[in-house]
UniProtKB/Swiss-Prot annotation:
Record's protein name: Large ribosomal subunit protein bL28
Origin species: Psychromonas ingrahamii (strain DSM 17664 / CCUG 51855 / 37)
GO function terms (MF aspect): structural constituent of ribosome
Gene, per the UniProt record: rpmB
Keywords: Ribonucleoprotein, Ribosomal protein
GO biological process, one term: translation
Length: 78
């Protein structure tokens, strides 16, 4: 499973670890992904999504039905 948020599309970023001596080594910044089940009243079932905590806040704000239509418009099967 890829480390991509289904709501925001956020994916791992690449940067550097910087030591006290300013030595730089490459590293990945991973998104804060969570797997969460949401109850969808209109479909009378649970939907499991892999999303970041920011994606959860977006669902709190817009509602699960609105977010699911956006995800399905992108072509993802949910």
């Amino acid at each position: 499973m890829s480390r991509v948020c289904q709501v925001t599309g956020k994916r791992p970023a690449v940067g550097n670890n910087v030591s006290h001596a300013k030595n730089r080594t490459r590293r990945r910044f991973l998104p804060n992904l969570q797997t969460h089940r949401f109850w969808v009243e209109s479909e009378n079932r649970f939907v499991k999504l892999r999303l970041t905590t920011k994606g959860m806040r977006i669902i709190d704000k817009k509602g699960i039905d609105s977010v699911l239509t956006d995800i399905r418009a992108k072509g993802e099967k949910v």
